[in-house]
């Protein structure tokens, strides 16, 4: 299946967005990509698209905001369980394994780094607050990308998608 590609913007309507978004829209529409159109942040998180294209600044703001919201939700659940009385504590004990799975899924140190696309090379960026576990995982992710020849695969896929 072809991944659904969206362009992160301030609204779904084609005319919305900054200069970069407006300039990118016809390039995506003219490609062989499965272009969904403009998407807002809620649609990225909600799964309407598989790939959200954005510039580094906006993408970083969205990423860090998403991480903060995830942490806030986890903290609120913990607080509600801790302060909710005996039944809440029992319920918390029952859901703890599931919550730990979700926490691990949302933990950026599990991957350690994300690829910076748009450069002619493999570049991975980690959090400035990465610990040894995150850095170890970042090296693992980067090594896997080198072993899988990801850069050439991305270049080939982009070249093919731009042919019409």
Each model region followed by its residue ranges:
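Glycine-rich phosphate/diphosphate-binding loop of Rossmann-like nucleotide-binding domains
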Residues: 1-41, 50, 55
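Glycine-rich oxoanion-binding loops at beta->alpha junctions
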Residues: 38-46, 110-111
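Glycine-rich phosphate/nucleotide-binding loop
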Residues: 51-52, 56-164
């Amino acid at each position: 299946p072809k991944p659904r590609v969206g362009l992160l913007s301030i609204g779904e309507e084609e005319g919305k967005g900054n200069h970069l978004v407006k300039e990118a829209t016809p390039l995506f529409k003219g490609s062989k990509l499965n272009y969904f159109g403009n998407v807002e942040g809620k649609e990225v998180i909600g799964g309407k698209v598989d790939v959200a294209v954005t510039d580094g600044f906006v993408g970083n703001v969205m990423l860090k905001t998403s991480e903060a919201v995830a942490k806030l939700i986890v903290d609120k659940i913990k607080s509600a369980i801790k302060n909710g009385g005996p039944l809440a504590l029992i319920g918390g004990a029952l859901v703890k394994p599931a919550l730990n799975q979700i926490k691990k899924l949302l933990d950026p140190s599990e991957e350690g780094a994300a690829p910076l696309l748009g450069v002619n090379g493999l570049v991975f960026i980690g959090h400035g607050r990465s610990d040894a576990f995150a850095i170890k995982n970042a090296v693992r992710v980067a090594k896997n990308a080198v072993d899988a020849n990801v850069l050439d695969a991305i270049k080939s896929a982009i070249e093919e998608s731009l042919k019409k």
